[in-house]
Structures are given as C-alpha cells and as structure tokens.
C-alpha cells in the first residue's frame, strides 16, 4: 500500500472553488491543446520505465496518468480527499517527471509539465511528500535545500582551500570575485556531506587556469526541488537567486555541478 501524502493542514476540507481557482489560470491555450490533442496512440508507453518495470501495466502509460486533470475539470473540482490521495499515489509513486514520454510524443505533449500541474494542485490542498516540503522550506529560509547558512557555506569553501594548499600550491577558491569568467554553483549536499567534490572541481579549474568564483550569498545551490512538487513560486525564486548573483558579480557564465 502506498504511503499517505503528507498533509500540511490535516483538517483542511476540500474546497471545489479553490481547486478551480488554482487550475483555471494555468489551463491556457497550450494546456488545453495538450489535453485535447492526445490520440491515445500509446507511443509514450514503452518510454516509461514504470510501465516496463510493471509488466506493461496499462495504468502505467504516461498519457493515462494525466487523466486526472480532465476528470477534475469535468467534476468542477468536486472531489474528496480519497480521490486526491489516488492522484497523489499516481503522480508521485508512478512518475518521476523524467520527460522521456515527452520526447517520444508525436504531438509534443509535455506530460511531465502536466504532472507538475497536478503536483502543484495537491500542494495547494496540503498534500506533498514530507522530504520535498522540508527542502522547499529550507530554500525559502536559507536559499538552499540543505539549510546551510551563509557562514557555514563560506567556512566550508575556505576549509576546502586550506586542505588543498599543500597538494596544489597557489590553488584558490575565489569567493565573490567580480568580473570572473565563470560563477560556479553546486549541489547543496556537497558542502553539507561531500566537500571533496568541491575540492576536485577546484583542482580542475586551477590546473586549467580558469577564471572563476563562487558566490557567498544565496544562489550557489543549483538544485531546484521545488519544481518537483509544483511550487512554481519557490522554483522561480531559486533560479532568480542564481541569476541575481551572476549579475552582481558581473560574470560571463554560470557553471553547474555534475
């Protein structure tokens, strides 16, 4: 049995008007076209690893998973918590938004984006995985998913530089260097758990003679878990933080980890 969705407001009742108010502004011409143009050809089926791993269960076909949007619109948002739990189980446990299905769709229907819309709808009703909610809260408070403070981030960078001092004489990890060619960003798990990854990249930049820097303020975390629960507002904030730092430091390019 699939685990129940985390509910931010346990006693919150489902409000049909609230559901429709969430969906209507987002169902523009593009979404309407996608919802109406699907020919149920099944070409997306074999692209889905959930479909293949389940013994080709028809319920795992990507096009079938997004049926909930049309159902909710047809019902004018009049659904119960049990129905939304069914939606949750499908869009979180049977899809990871990899977009393989989108690449193979002859009509270019972005099924992952439709799944994201459903995840955003569930979030508006207080339903999302606890881990994602915690990460989103960390983004909002600290600017990164791992709740790393500015002080800890800078201290980690300085420690990495010190650790490599004997191995590579003259190696520096510039912080807030204006006019550098590259601003390097990382996965927030690196300063938290894997600082050696930062050190390896620093070695590459040093040997290559690259002109680079890292920002001290929010914008150094290049992950964006908010988009995986349909939180567009927070997802936008994360990206804007990175662009803001790049503009402030007047760099030419932004490079990301991995």
Describe these PLM feature segments.
Residues 6-40, 45-82, 87:
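N-terminal cysteine/histidine-rich coordination modules
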